[in-house]
Amino acid sequence: MERYFVHFKGGLYKLIAIASHSETLEEFAVYLALYGTGKVWIRPINMFFSKVNIRGVEVERFKEITKKEMLCLLKSQKEHI
């Protein structure tokens, strides 16, 4: 199942996999930027799904969105370039 997320700063991402560190077994989110050169990133899973405080309001660092929402946001971003 494809999973898409929007970062609290506005970037769009596709979650590629949940990976485990070979030594510590710590889990990481592996995700692809859906903008620019499409860089692949990793982040500890607990950080990926954490909340951040923006001017006193807690918001999800990465908010899960549907594929339809992702396509609408991508189209909107491309129109502003």
Residue spans of the language-model regions?
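Mixed-charge, low-complexity intrinsically disordered regions
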Residues: M1-I81
